[in-house]
């Protein structure tokens, strides 16, 4: 059973609000729900082009439901700053917290482990602690903490599709280890302090205004410059690509259904905790994905019609920390929230290519 939450007239904290997923979520909520106040937090770091984050954040500020004021306030800051987080929670009574702030990137974590520990573990701990203290003095407290995990926690899992019931005790990257740590910490806080927590394992998110370090975006940048793109594991990689609108739809449905608070037969609280995959459920071979991407880039006018694709592809070995396949079993999400991702690769890449053409024309 889930405790139903109506998003109208709610105070919501979204961390990572200028990030790919955070901005798309913020804009969707502001356009569809009345009386909502969103506090968006982001450190706006330079892991990738800060101008893209500014672009997303401007879209956050302008997003609104017709006839209603925009209820968005932006705070530039790092959730690893405990004083900042504590002050936010003291100033605002949050009904729902969505923690999307994190240092992303599997390969980047190999050479920069410190920033992952700071943001993904210390930062998340600060959020958990702040949520815990919203219950002080018998107050109602945060009704639901939703946080981002990742498909990377599955590591080299041989069983497909990946289920949340599968053991994930052997991460192959530091990024994955921090995300698994988030799940463990959230479960502990749900058990000890009865905080309703739901973790979401996202599978290879793509779409307009995405992260330039993601394969589809970086490949587009390189192709546009006439450079060669590397396709890992000699093309024998499959990814469960999931379009951003499907990810956001999944998050919004989950936000509105918190794990129920109840007691077990021993009279002790059962942790109000849940974990779901959000993935398309249709792994795509990278070579096929690239072919579709190139076709849509030509269609959008990003690449010329006579572009020599084969001259700009190079098959290379698997990279450290990478895995050959990701494949989501999202039946739990369908069972509990009635939702399954629906947007196919060609439709999603077409929307990305059209956005890319418009964005870089605007930037020129």
Task: Give the residues covered by each predicted segment.
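A glycine/serine/threonine-rich, flexible loop-to-helix segment
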Residues: 160-161, 212-220
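N-terminal Rossmann-like NAD(P)+-binding domain of SDR-like oxidoreductases, especially those catalyzing
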Residues: 1-205, 292, 359-362
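Short beta-strand/turn micro-motifs at beta-sheet edges
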Residues: 158, 192, 219, 262-266
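Generic recognition of short, well-ordered alpha-helical segments
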Residues: 24, 87, 108-111, 122, ...
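C-terminal substrate-binding subdomain of Rossmann-fold SDR/epimerase-dehydratase oxidoreductases
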Residues: 1-5, 9, 28, 70, ...
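Amphipathic alpha-helical recognition patches that constitute DNA-binding helices
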Residues: 16, 20, 169, 173, ...
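Residue-level recognition of oxygen-bearing side chains
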Residues: 84, 93, 115, 122, ...
